[in-house]
Amino acid sequence: MDKRILLTLALGAMSQVFTHAWEPKGDKIKTVWAEQVTPENVWQSYPRPQLQRAEWINLNGLWKYAVTDQNTSRKNVSFEGEILVPFAIESSLSGVQKTFLPTDKLWYQREFSLDPSWKNKSAILHFGAVDYECQVWVNNRLVGTHKGGNNPFSFDITKYLKKSGPQSIEVAVTDPTDTESISRGKQQLNQEGIWYTPVSGIWQTVWLEAVNKTYIRQVLPSTDIERKSVKLAFDIAGAKGNEEVKIEVLDDGKVIKTVEQKLTNAMEIDVPNAVLWSPESPKLYHLNIVLSNGGRVLDRVKSYFALRKVDVRKDECGYNRICLNNQPIFQYGPLDQGWWPDGLLTPPSEEAMLWDMVQLKKMGFNMIRKHIKVEPEQYYYYADSLGLMM
């Protein structure tokens, strides 16, 4: 047989082995979205709607993993297989579905490459959530640690990167679950009654973004419905004190207001023909923000806001009432645990998460009582877009 044909067949066989290596584990009930999940398409959308940048790398997908006792050192770790990030090791969609004990340590490892356009820029490594305590290494150097299973965190890994070639990330995780007094929701090692399967390790998106030395770390909008304005508070990393900012306010994709001025800690912008947000009319305004210095662009981000006001007022009988835009509002919604049979705390996909919310809206609910869980940041953007109070 032609050697080229043999080589093609061999490569094809290798490709099939790699493609079919991952699959959901276990025979427990799964959602219809489970069969659509692949290592190539898992949670690929930009993970932070409130502050979006163009240059980023999604690190979800297959990572090497190992489970050891907590006394095992990094140099003695032998990886035993692959795990699909961002699903917890106990979940079916991780491809592992193993019980993880408080005496265990979970190790992750993967490689990535940087685009040449990232040269002379800083690289920020983001974790949406890791349950519960973790250490992170880049190219065999400890970058930092984090404790807490629900909140996002990040590290500037620029100084740990090699000038070229593949870069390596390793993560080590421990999780006491219910053996310590920590924020764990309904996780319990012995599932019974109202208690659920534990969630250990990476369970939200891991990603990298490129920024300049001076960049927008955070933009926080707060609105005033009486003044029909939005105030933007900025947190700027590496600010020199002479930066300028250009802000465009967009309504349905059309620029309705442009402001250019020297950057200050907080800026108030009037919104022309302002429309208030409500569950019946969930109006969102979008922002294009450009940070510059002497004509040189330092950063470009997108964000959004809604004109609304939530407070508590006395009614005619003297009872406290929650009000939206100065009017009492009856909140009608379910207690939502946010657990999935196949992904546990992690929805199998963004489509699955959105479908759930759309159905609640169709049922006539105007709010969701999210129960002992912090969702991925996309969840709250969809709530704003659909008209669901949280």
Predicted regions and their residues:
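Active-site mouth of glycoside hydrolases
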Residues: 137, 147-160, 178-189, 193-196, ...
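N-terminal pre-domain segments of enzymes
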Residues: 22-56
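Beta-strand-rich binding/interaction modules
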Residues: 138, 228-261, 287
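Surface beta-strand/loop "capping" patches
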Residues: 210-240, 316-321
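Bacterial Sec-dependent N-terminal signal peptides
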Residues: 1-23
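Accessory beta-strand-rich segments of carbohydrate-active enzymes
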Residues: 64-68, 98-99, 103-215, 239, ...
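Conserved, mostly hydrophobic/aromatic
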Residues: 63, 140, 206, 285, ...
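Short hydrophobic beta-strand segments in globular cytosolic domains
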Residues: 143-144, 256, 329
